[in-house]
Amino acid sequence: MLLSVVAIALLAYLLGSFPAGYLAGRWLKGIDIRKEGSGSTGATNVLRVLGKGPALVVFITDILKGVLAVVAARAIASTNGLDPSAIAWLAAFAAIIAVVGHSLPVWLSFRGGKSVATSLGVLLALSPVVGLSGFGAFLLLLALFRIVSLGSIAGAITVIVLMLILPEPLPNKILGIASGIYVIYRHRSNLDRLRRGEEPRIGQRLSTNR
């Protein structure tokens, strides 16, 4: 059991911390994406700095990191003969590790993204209805206001609310609520700009005062 937990934690962190946005900046423009735009390695900053194509690739990659972390955790736990309850808890554990790994990658001095896409990935793997509902809320707010951070926060709130009211397994509830709160926490600077009316819309440049 202990070896399974260690293996799952290491693999989930390795997957979650894979720096897709950083590598896109290095490969396409020879830049450190952390020194451009908002300083995030996530798809939104990649969109701002590198354009739509690279941003879409990074977004999909970051989603897949979350999906693969959950799938791998289930596979490792199942191979070791663990019962369904233990598998569910280990899958949720891997999901949380992957989400945190995305935003705190050791390879980049713990400066990553805001874990939105990776959170979506783990939710799609663990609770597709909640994951798709959160993504739907994100798309709706994005379409109405063209502010990515507002959509991300709305999606996180939607996930939290649904996990509280729907009959989801306890491990999924804890993962969903924790990841939702974490995503909102990672958007602290965005919330400050939203309150001041300074948060950029898609296509607008971010102020140098982050």
UniProtKB/Swiss-Prot annotation:
GO terms for molecular function: acyl-phosphate glycerol-3-phosphate acyltransferase activity. This is Glycerol-3-phosphate acyltransferase. It catalyses: an acyl phosphate + sn-glycerol 3-phosphate = a 1-acyl-sn-glycero-3-phosphate + phosphate. Keywords: Cell inner membrane, Cell membrane, Lipid biosynthesis, Lipid metabolism, Membrane, Phospholipid biosynthesis, Phospholipid metabolism, Transferase, Transmembrane, Transmembrane helix. InterPro entries: G3P_acylTferase_PlsY. Pfam families: G3P_acyltransf (PF02660). The keyword Membrane applies.
